[in-house]
């Protein structure tokens, strides 16, 4: 669908030279001299390559429509993750590469937003935070302050995160899926 660069938003899918690119970030710039332009950081949907690209303001572009669906993670199968559409109960195989590094926070039963274009999955978005159980951590000693009162801990998915000294094995913690940071205790 033809629109202009003024319609660019984060998450927009652009068709440039027959390839799909997702806008990661954008900025409309109006310099004191010269015409306005749009500076973007875009990611190739298929290859994952990230590039910076600048467009003239008002330039016509092809935007693609994307279907966002909420799917529930079921299990891992080789190089794919299997998700279930909870309305139709269809199982959908999604390549691990689409989930990327966030896979270490993926727990069975987690609802994720999956973007599709022409029936093909483009991206998987995990919730902003997940609740995970600590499976292993060393006891925290109060006098050990070499690292601002945190210690490494392994969660049930196998990911390693930094937690406060008072957190022990078996406790549930809230973890940010963007950077893996500890957000708090969960009861």
UniProtKB/Swiss-Prot annotation:
A GO biological process of this protein is: peptide biosynthetic process
Q: Does the keyword section mention Cytoplasm?
A: yes
What pathway is this protein a component of?
A: Protein biosynthesis; polypeptide chain elongation
Coiled-coil region(s) at which residues? none
By its UniProt entry, which SMART domains does this protein fall under? EFP (SM01185), Elong-fact-P_C (SM00841)
In which compartments does the protein localize?
Cytoplasm
A GO molecular function annotation here is: translation elongation factor activity
A Pfam cross-reference name: Elong-fact-P_C
| Predominant location category | cytoplasm
Q: Write the record's keywords in alphabetical order, separated by commas.
A: Cytoplasm, Elongation factor, Protein biosynthesis
Classification via NCBIfam families: efp, PRK00529.1
Describe the function of this protein: Involved in peptide bond synthesis. Stimulates efficient translation and peptide-bond synthesis on native or reconstituted 70S ribosomes in vitro. Probably functions indirectly by altering the affinity of the ribosome for aminoacyl-tRNA, thus increasing their reactivity as acceptors for peptidyl transferase.
**Name under which the protein is recorded:** Elongation factor P
Q: Which organism is it from?
A: Bifidobacterium animalis subsp. lactis (strain AD011)
